[in-house]
């Protein structure tokens, strides 16, 4: 389902737009700026901008209605608290748990850092199956690490205690290709995997069965060089997707938002 935005967000940076849902509000990040939207008549109505004293690289929402913003190499702050509470001063990349109580940080080696904001502790962990990490996603019950070993891309899925659940490689997919997992979400029926290098969405059951692969063009009606790099879950269990797609006149890219329902 396409969610029209009543403001247009042209951008020359493909693949950097993000979306978060928190406290009944939508937040959209484009080119370092964050805007707030309400849900109105099946679309998004602009309510105002959210200001930070740094360029924002990513945004997250938690189950308690808080909004978080991550700067370039830090900081990670909780917005709306006094002076925007700083949770991490320095971090290259971070994925926040939906509770807001913990997060996973990583760079491009094969090690990650687990952050526990309740205890103020952190722990290093090596992801042995890969030589380097491309992305990490944290959902309610799972953590997904997309990395590479030699020339092969691997998606390793773990539970909250870092017990390995399964590994997906290119040989497991219908297309025979798995290149760059840019987003990963957990629904009531399984996992939704966005491979923006191949422009595919892969639906996987909790039993590990790959149920369906659908192209971005087929699912979203995208045009040229579409890239999904921002997703979140709403309160009803739908996947909210921020995608950048090239305009028909090739003048620039534009941030568009979809709601993925039914899985």
Positions of PLM-derived features:
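Short loop/turn segments that connect beta-strands within beta-propeller blades
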Residues: 39-42, 79-82, 116-120, 159-163, ...
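Repeated scaffold domains used in trafficking and secretory/extracellular systems
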Residues: 13-21, 54-63, 89-99, 130-139, ...
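A short beta-strand motif characteristic of beta-propeller blades
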Residues: 2-10, 43-52, 82-88, 121-128, ...
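Conserved beta-strand positions in repeat-built beta-propeller and related beta-rich domains
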Residues: 20, 27-31, 38, 61, ...
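Loop/turn-rich, solvent-exposed surfaces of beta-rich toroidal or solenoidal domains
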Residues: 176-203
